């Protein structure tokens, strides 16, 4: 049977970490340093709540001020120095009951691991725009790589505010004749060099402080209504496609597909060793809906999850600390 080039059927990681914020990256430092083959899958360079924080001054051992993105880069370099592998890719599905466990990304890749640490944060949207669900698959999309080619030489809107949204918009701009990049806030949360490159694309128009109100059409999308927060007026963009890449505060756990125990608010339930209801699957960070949302707290949970993974993989009777 032919095997897709996007798969690596013979490569099995000891641990796959989903998310590269402080919890996921700290976990990677510990598992890689312990000698376990470690893969970290992350959605964007400025991943998670820390990645878009403008100034950090209270992270122990790191004199500030520095941006959350800069702090993440320091942590990732430390994890890489121990052998952790970082791969950019948005996780859309998992099979946690297979052996080994499987993780799938939006671009069609499959990764396999003996254990999983879910550290994907809490930045999903809880509420959808009017018309979003109605036109899903008929002009509304959450994947530029998947659907951009359907809008060749057509105008589209891309809704987002970070470097992940920019990356998707840049790909979409290869096909669409016009890309309106709609940002609800007053700024884009991405490294300056990324924004500068994006602004130079000839068929891209950035609309700051424009809040989406409604996606309109008949059988397919015909446009999107926006509220110009600067001029305090509504406008209609005539577009044939709307790509949505916005975040929120809801735990990012859709890819788990209900395979682990969660609360009504989609918070993952773990035991004292950070293990979920599925053996070999652990969780750390904001996916647990902690009352205190601080980078150092998330990092501590990532450490604890990593030590529990070490215990699980090695068959030890108790968690052994690292120094």
UniProtKB/Swiss-Prot annotation:
GO cellular component: cytoplasm
Reaction equations catalysed: [thioredoxin]-dithiol + NADP(+) = [thioredoxin]-disulfide + NADPH + H(+)
Keywords carried by this UniProt record: Cytoplasm, Disulfide bond, FAD, Flavoprotein, NADP, Oxidoreductase, Redox-active center
Enzyme Commission no: 1.8.1.9
GO molecular function: thioredoxin-disulfide reductase (NADPH) activity
Record InterPro entries: FAD/NAD-bd_sf, FAD/NAD-binding_dom, Ferredoxin-NADP_redctase_2, Pyr_nucl-diS_OxRdtase_2_AS, Thioredox_Rdtase
Cofactor note: Binds 1 FAD per subunit.
Entry cofactors: FAD
Gene3D superfamilies: FAD/NAD(P)-binding domain
Location(s) in or outside the cell: Cytoplasm
Disulfide bond entries: 143-146
Keyword Aminoacyl-tRNA synthetase found: no
Class of this enzyme: oxidoreductase
Keyword match NADP: yes
Any one of the GO BP annotations: removal of superoxide radicals
Binding site residues for FAD: 42-49, 286-295
Miscellaneous field: The active site is a redox-active disulfide bond.
Subunit organization: Homodimer.
Family label: Belongs to the class-II pyridine nucleotide-disulfide oxidoreductase family.
Protein name per the record: Thioredoxin reductase
Species the sequence originates in: Aquifex aeolicus (strain VF5)
Gene (UniProt): trxB
